[in-house]
């Protein structure tokens, strides 16, 4: 399947195996034609080092990492290890998405559309305009 995704110009695969399957993930990492990005595997700073060698990059979610400082430190460490960085989210308000967007200069990819999944967002801090994250005044 990953080979097919590569042929379809997919950019990466986000954690295709359960986080407990470490040996299997190591095997896949050595053979995959696409970068594999850790998601459920990591939440905090020590997890970045554990992901090194198993994954090509990490998906940092602000709500899982306990906040801006830890997420920033995770991104800096991942880049120092020559890993790709993705800033992601869960279903969150645009207030949380706006905070996560502040880290996007450190990221190779940003997947910050969780606020689009809620109908009663109390905030108006970020919109997706023509495929780009736009922070409002």
Residue ranges and their predicted role:
Residues 26-29, 36-42:
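Oxyanion-binding "anion nests"
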Residues 13-14, 36-39, 58-60, 85-88, ...:
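Hydrophobic faces of well-ordered beta-strands that scaffold small-molecule active sites
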